[in-house]
Every structure is written in structure tokens, then in C-alpha cells.
Amino acid sequence: MSGEGRPQASVPQAGELRLGIAAIRWHAKITDRLLERALAAASEAGVAEPTVVRVPGSIELPVVCQQLAHQHDAVVALGVVIRGGTPHFEYVCDSVTAGLTRVSLDESTPVGNGVLTCDTEEQALARAGFEDSAEDKGFEATAAALETALVLRELRGFENGRGFL
């Protein structure tokens, strides 16, 4: 895990934005904590009532995030994929990452990728935002999605002659 070069996580004031969060049910201890931290970031940003949807697993995240993107300014995907003894890990990770990127581009809506792809459960715990975790990916993914939504809002205003303030 390399934290070198990582900027300090800051949460923008984004109370006017609509946020959708999709979280998987697998690895509940970790995923529930990712969700708690995502909701903490949303609250800190002033987002009153994010839409939260639970899905069976990581493969289902892209299609649910695509639907959320139709009605929200920013979306966050939360989950955990832990390497096993078969190539399934690579298939799932590649599919989820490509799917979430495609949703973001196709819908012009930022999708914060808070899906942990780890070799071990210990690595996932270290990234999930617990008291003794080195990283806080649910919080970070939410802050990034909200900040990007605000940048897009300003850029779209620029197209209408407003520009950045």
C-alpha cells in the first residue's frame, strides 16, 4: 500500500448535489464500514439524504450505478473483492472497473470507485476506514465523486458562458 503522493482528502460543500451510493452485500463487516464512511463524507459535504442501494455483489455494481446516474449528480460504488485461488478475481475486478468507468463516461456523471481489490482480508480492513486503518476508501471515493460533480457543473456552466467562479 503506497500513500506516497496521495493528496489530503477534503470534502467540498455540495449540499445541492444528489448522491447515489451502491454497496455490495459480500464481506459485510468491511462493506458496511465503507458505507458508513461514505455517508460520513456525504454528511460533511452537506448532502442531506443520499440514495443508498444494496446489491448482491460487485458484478452488479455497474448496472445499478448506471441507473443511479440517471437521477443523481454523483454516484459511489462500494465493495470488496478478495483474491481466491482461481482467475475469477481478475475477471470480476476487470469487469467492475471497466463497467464503472463506462457508466461514468456514458452518463457524464462521476462514479467514485470505492471497490477494494485486495489479496487478503487484512489488506481490505486496512483500507476500509476503521480506527486503525491506514486508508479510508469509502470516504475518499465519496469526496472525489462530489468534487468531480462540482467541477462538471462549473464546466457545463462555462459552455453556457458562465465559466468558473
From Swiss-Prot:
Keywords: Riboflavin biosynthesis, Transferase. One of its GO terms (molecular function) is 6,7-dimethyl-8-ribityllumazine synthase activity. It is an enzyme of class 2 (transferase). GO terms for cellular component: cytosol; riboflavin synthase complex. The active site is at residue 88. Pfam families: DMRL_synthase. (2S)-2-hydroxy-3-oxobutyl phosphate binds at residues 85-86, 127. GO terms for biological process: riboflavin biosynthetic process. Pathway: Cofactor biosynthesis; riboflavin biosynthesis; riboflavin from 2-hydroxy-3-oxobutyl phosphate and 5-amino-6-(D-ribitylamino)uracil: step 1/2. The keyword Transferase applies. Its EC number is 2.5.1.78. 5-amino-6-(D-ribitylamino)uracil binds at residues 26, 58-60, 80-82, 113. It catalyses: (2S)-2-hydroxy-3-oxobutyl phosphate + 5-amino-6-(D-ribitylamino)uracil = 6,7-dimethyl-8-(1-D-ribityl)lumazine + phosphate + 2 H2O + H(+). Belongs to the DMRL synthase family. Catalyzes the formation of 6,7-dimethyl-8-ribityllumazine by condensation of 5-amino-6-(D-ribitylamino)uracil with 3,4-dihydroxy-2-butanone 4-phosphate. This is the penultimate step in the biosynthesis of riboflavin. This is 6,7-dimethyl-8-ribityllumazine synthase.
